[in-house]
């Protein structure tokens, strides 16, 4: 795999097989452990079928090694805000700029859609904190979920 892997966009012209492959990736044990949540196929289907949402993925020899789901419209977002809902890279592929390339692709889509801010919810104790900071995101607010998980809302102007 090259250092500058270009993310593939899964949109209405993609296939159901693409969505299923991304679903399987997000639900791999190593990925779920980092995300600390289960990804529902119906959520990915909405990202596949709605014009304000996108799935991006990177593959190596036909294997999905990284993926991102984002959306530009939601009742929980400000009018000018897009959000990266999920982003993950297989552990053995981290440190190669793949996550950064996925986030840049999401930011580009959000700008094309007319958004000026990108956000991401991140667990406060996550190893991904440094990743988000390296991309220019800053903590906008901190809170605790109903089940006691400490979270940070990272955001940046795009």
Name every feature range the model reports, one short phrase each:
Residues 101-117:
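Conserved acyl-CoA
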